[in-house]
UniProtKB/Swiss-Prot annotation:
High-level lineage: Bacteria, Bacillati, Actinomycetota, Actinomycetes, Mycobacteriales
Protein name per UniProt: Large ribosomal subunit protein bL20
Stored InterPro entries: Ribosomal_bL20, RIBOSOMAL_L20_CS, Ribosomal_protein_bL20_C
Native species: Corynebacterium kroppenstedtii (strain DSM 44385 / JCM 11950 / CIP 105744 / CCUG 35717)
Family the entry assigns: Belongs to the bacterial ribosomal protein bL20 family.
GO cellular component assignments: ribonucleoprotein complex; ribosome
Annotated CDD domains: Ribosomal_L20 (cd07026)
GO terms, molecular function: rRNA binding; structural constituent of ribosome
Gene field: rplT
Main function: Binds directly to 23S ribosomal RNA and is necessary for the in vitro assembly process of the 50S ribosomal subunit. It is not involved in the protein synthesizing functions of that subunit.
């Protein structure tokens, strides 16, 4: 069999790794072995955090909705329950956006939710 010389491919591979490791601190941006290891960890964090971001944003939306709901004398869970009973189908992202940008519309939704809720807290839903 013919001898395989891979200097061109190996250099290209190393150059790509070092290029993608730019901005890392210390040896992690200059030494191939350290840079490669850091790239593997970076990809792991990248994958994990793309999924975690969805939950983080949901928590942020719920916090914003709860704060705005309390300004309208409601709690978050009563607001969501009232909106569901009133037949208002709006997701938390848009509800949080309304709470921040359009307080009058959010107050109208709170009023609709209050009307749909039963008077007695422990009473079953309509």
């Amino acid at each position: 069999m013919a001898r395989v010389k891979r200097s061109v491919n190996a250099k290209k591979k190393r150059r790509e790794v070092l290029k993608s490791a730019k901005g890392y601190r210390g040896q992690r941006s200059r030494l191939y072995r350290k840079a490669k290891e850091q790239m593997l960890h970076s990809k792991t964090y990248e994958f994990r955090d793309r999924r975690a971001k969805k939950g983080d944003f949901r928590k942020l939306w719920i916090t914003r909705i709860n704060a705005a709901a309390r300004q309208n004398d409601m709690t978050y869970n009563r607001l969501i329950q009232g909106l569901r009973l009133a037949g208002v189908d709006i997701d938390r992202k848009n509800l949080a956006d309304l709470a921040v940008s359009d307080e009058q519309a959010f107050s109208a939704l709170c009023a609709a939710a209050k009307d749909a809720l039963p008077e007695d807290v422990n009473a079953p839903a309509k």
